[in-house]
């Protein structure tokens, strides 16, 4: 079976989609965003196609596309859509699959189910994206604790933003996890710049093995 990698984050708006695009491009993978909330601006799938350099057929359609830009549970209620979490199964593809969640681990899909509940059922290796700015230590360690409590395999932490060596080190040490690398802020955000930035900071094979 080809590698299946779930990309999640400690919070929303930290650059998780940009990282997912870089990872999918580096692995020549297929990308899937199960639930998209908000359709007025560029969707995450659209951004990944633009930034990854992948062909359109490598971007799988979302299982749910919600018009309202809100947490999936609320967006679904406003839009009159019932999210069937049991129907959210990992697609079967012949190449590596990069799956992107929404916001953080505890984002609710329904009034009863959060993203991390689905991740636990999938049991696929997970990459935790974390910002490097103030407050990241607490948010990241809490996220790692939630992941470990559910026995989800954790590949490691991918840091996003300006260098902050002490924060990165203490997270790795106290979280007993692996630092996968750090994607810096890019002056120009396009497919070529992102590909180069990822290649300089990460080793693709670290995402293809078993969680340490």
UniProtKB/Swiss-Prot annotation:
GO MF, any single term: magnesium ion binding
Catalytic activity, as annotated: (7R,8S)-7,8-diammoniononanoate + CO2 + ATP = (4R,5S)-dethiobiotin + ADP + phosphate + 3 H(+)
Gene transcribed to yield this protein: bioD
Catalytic residues (positions): 33
Binding, substrate: 37
A biological process term (GO) from this entry: biotin biosynthetic process
Naturally occurring in which organism (per UniProt): Rhodopseudomonas palustris (strain ATCC BAA-98 / CGA009)
Domain of life: Bacteria
One Pfam family, short name: AAA_26
Protein name (database record): ATP-dependent dethiobiotin synthetase BioD
């Amino acid at each position: 079976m080809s590698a299946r990698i779930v990309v999640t984050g400690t919070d929303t708006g930290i650059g998780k989609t940009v990282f997912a695009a870089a990872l999918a491009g580096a692995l020549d993978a297929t990308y899937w965003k199960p639930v998209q909330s908000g359709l007025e601006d560029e969707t995450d799938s659209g951004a990944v196609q633009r930034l990854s350099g992948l062909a359109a057929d490598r971007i799988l359609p979302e299982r749910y596309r919600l018009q309202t830009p809100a947490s999936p549970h609320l967006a679904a209620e406003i839009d009159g859509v019932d999210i069937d979490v049991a129907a959210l199964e990992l697609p079967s593809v012949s190449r590596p699959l990069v799956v992107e969640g929404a916001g953080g681990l505890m984002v609710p899909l329904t009034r009863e189910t959060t993203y991390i509940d689905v991740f636990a059922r999938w049991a696929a290796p997970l990459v935790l994206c974390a910002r490097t700015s103030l407050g990241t230590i607490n948010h990241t360690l809490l996220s790692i604790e939630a992941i470990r409590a559910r026995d989800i395999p954790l590949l490691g932490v991918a840091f996003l933003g300006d260098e902050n060596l002490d924060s990165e080190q203490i997270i790795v040490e106290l979280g007993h996890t692996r630092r996968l690398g750090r994607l810096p802020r890019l002056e120009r955000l396009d497919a070529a710049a992102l590909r180069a930035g990822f290649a300089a900071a990460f080793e693709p094979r670290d995402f293809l093995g078993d969680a340490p």
